[in-house]
Amino acid sequence: MAQEFVNCKIQSGKVVVFIKPTCPYCRKTQEILSQLPFKQGLLEFVDITATNNTSAIQDYLQQLTGARTVPRVFIGKDCIGGCSDLISMQQTGELMTRLKQIGALQL
């Protein structure tokens, strides 16, 4: 169930972030990504606490990405990590490059 839930969210051409709304790193990640000009429907924040499988979802994220912490940021099918990874990519310009590569932005 958790595996299906996560796998159906992750899609090429889309940015998906698995979050918990009370997490300050999740809020920072949402703030950063929400300022970018995404095409409609290509940025999704998934609140894993809204399911009754939060722990199982985090276990599967651990299996898939090597970490069970949130946020878990996927650009297309690739997990780039969490908030600090996103900030690093933003500072180097790699974030915009990757988002343009998958066609997620309105330019």
Swiss-Prot record:
This is Glutaredoxin-1. SUPFAM superfamilies: Thioredoxin-like. Disulfide bonds join C23-C26, C79-C83. Belongs to the glutaredoxin family. PROSITE patterns: GLUTAREDOXIN_1, GLUTAREDOXIN_2. It comes from the Eukaryota. GO terms for biological process: positive regulation of membrane potential. It comes from Mus musculus (Mouse). Its main location: cytoplasm. The modification N6-succinyllysine is found at K9. It is found in: Cytoplasm. Pfam families: Glutaredoxin (PF00462). Has a glutathione-disulfide oxidoreductase activity in the presence of NADPH and glutathione reductase. Reduces low molecular weight disulfides and proteins. PANTHER family: GLUTAREDOXIN-1 (PTHR46185:SF1). GO terms for molecular function: protein-disulfide reductase (glutathione) activity; sodium channel regulator activity. Changing C23S: Loss of activity. The modification N-acetylalanine is found at A2. Residues 3-106 form the Glutaredoxin domain. InterPro entries: GLR_AS, GLRX1, Glutaredoxin, Glutaredoxin_euk/vir, Glutaredoxin_subgr, Thioredoxin-like_sf. GO terms for cellular component: cytoplasm; mitochondrion; nucleus.
